[in-house]
Design a protein with these regions (language model features):
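Amphipathic alpha-helical segments in well-ordered regions
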Residues: 55, 223, 326, 339, ...
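Small-residue helix-packing motif on alpha-helices
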Residues: 159, 310, 336, 382, ...
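Extended, non-catalytic structural segments that build the interaction scaffolds
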Residues: 280-287, 324-331, 365-377
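Strongly charged, low-complexity linkers/loops
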Residues: 355-366, 370, 379-449
């Protein structure tokens, strides 16, 4: 069973007007409400309700049109009120499901028990040197939706496929950027093992501090093996919450795992029940976007690009939006796809960034593609310019003019340089004439070097072969 928490992309917090911006100096985005000061009263943010209902609709849930909030009572330093406002008895969404696609081509349905709204807690910062912990309440009161699955997943592969499906749904809705490394998407994995053929579930543990899909997969395998080892050695699995250390690939016990009755839930007296009228629900439904499956079918028909390209582009709302916007400007869908899947993904990997971190405009990418297609610059220069576009979103046309990067297409100038290269490299010339085709690559490289990378490579190859 997986519990997925997602911070919403909303400017204000769930019960107050403080900023939800990531970062900032500790305790700089706080007020009496989100720090739990006596006498402060919460006011529900309407947009949180709309996003939660939208996620519920997208995951085939039944929307609870009269839902309410409850207090979850517990003490922890990052919880200033000593209770968390959440939903237990009447959550906003229930009884949904999503279909996940597995590597062997099969599809499996994962049931969703409920989706509820709640406020986030603060953050503890541990100082190992001074052996103290500091509390930052900048995250306290940030709106969350929690998606609780049924225990339908049987492997790490299924868990990752399920989480990825939810990530895409939430991103396409614009409800969250779902960055695990920043905590805007979090997954707690509840895991138990049982003997083959047994119907009864074993004792479950909950694993926290999972900040990437790969860490989740490693933690699942480690916890599965730990529980099997305990059972096979005659020991009992303890119901507890464990913290994952990805560097050590090991989890350790944090505290005993509580059940709902341990939190002494009761209705929050400061918040009235939420009524979602039929008209309001239909308005939310009418704003549902085109999701990945529908987008893939449209791309195949409208743009005619390969299925592989379509799968990569639609796996991120940011990439899909950038692809469509750039293609609308330059009408070169395959060229746009190549730049996004090639250079863009390469740089993202090098910088350890996500597609959602892209800041360059479709206009400047379209201009770069236009410069290459017109023969104004060659491919190698275009890649250098794209690095600047990625980092600074420069205008490539202006950059080419300012730095004199226009491609040399003058046959006379090219021929003169190539003749000098041939004269300076007799061994490579002889190798080529003796049947070593690769030798011409060296001569092309020397020509490009002599012309500072601005020579037209097609013309260089043609003239070289003619002269040789």
């Amino acid at each position: 069973r997986s519990l997925v928490g997602s911070e919403m992309c909303i400017r204000d917090r769930i019960f107050c007007g403080c900023s939800t911006a990531f970062g900032g100096s500790p305790n700089s985005h706080t007020c009496p409400v989100c720090t739990g000061m006596p006498g402060s009263l919460p006011v529900l943010n309407k947009q949180v309700v709309e996003y939660a209902a939208a996620v519920g609709l997208a995951t085939n849930c039944t929307i609870t049109q009269n839902c309410k909030f409850d207090r979850k009572n517990y003490f922890y330093p990052d919880n200033p009120q000593n209770y968390q406002i959440s939903q237990l008895y009447l959550p906003i969404c229930r009884n949904g499901h999503v279909d996940i696609e597995l590597e062997d081509g099969t599809t499996k349905q994962i049931r969703i028990h409920e989706i509820h709204m709640e406020e986030d807690a603060g953050k503890l910062v541990h100082d190992e040197w001074d052996d103290v912990s500091y509390v930052d309440y900048n995250r306290s009161g940030v709106p969350l939706i929690e998606i609780v699955s049924e225990p339908d997943m049987r492997s790490a592969e299924e868990v990752i496929a399920y989480l990825d499906k939810l990530r895409l749904i939430i991103q396409y809705l614009g409800a969250s950027d779902c960055k695990l490394q920043e905590g805007s998407m979090r997954a707690d994995v509840n895991l138990s093992v049982r003997e083959a053929g047994s119907e009864a579930f074993g004792t479950r543990t909950e694993t926290k501090n999972l900040n990437s899909f790969s860490a989740i997969a490693r933690a699942i395998e480690a916890e599965k093996n730990r529980q099997i080892d305990l059972i096979e050695s005659g020991e009992a699995v303890v119901q507890e919450t464990r913290r994952w250390d990805d560097n050590k690939e090991y989890s350790y016990a944090m505290r005993s795992k509580e059940d709902a009755q341990d939190y002494r839930y009761f209705p929050d007296p400061d918040l009235v029940p939420v009524h979602i009228s039929d008209a309001w629900l239909e308005e939310i439904r009418s704003r549902q976007p085109e999701f990945k499956t529908e987008k893939m079918a449209r791309y195949k028909e409208e743009f005619g690009i390969p299925d592989y390209d379509i799968g990569i582009l639609t796996d991120s709302k940011k990439l899909a939006d950038l692809f469509e916007a750039t293609t609308a400007i330059c009408s070169q869908p395959k060229k746009v796809s190549n730049w996004l899947m090639g250079e863009t993904m390469r740089i993202l990997k090098e910088k350890e960034m996500e597609p959602e971190d892209i800041t360059f405009s479709p206009e400047n990418l379209a201009k770069l593609i236009g410069l290459v297609e017109a023969g104004t610059i060659n491919g190698s220069v275009a890649k250098e310019i794209f690095e600047k576009i990625f980092d600074e979103d420069i205008n490539p046309e202006q950059y080419v003019e300012e730095h004199g990067l226009k491609q040399v297409n003058d046959e006379g100038a090219l021929r003169a340089t190539i003749e000098e290269v041939i004269a300076a490299n007799p061994q490579s010339v002889e190798d080529y004439r003796n049947g070593k085709e690769k030798a011409i690559g060296f001569l092309v490289g020397q020509t490009m070097k002599a012309m500072k990378g601005k020579a037209n490579p097609g013309m260089v190859n043609q003239i070289l072969k003619e002269l040789l």
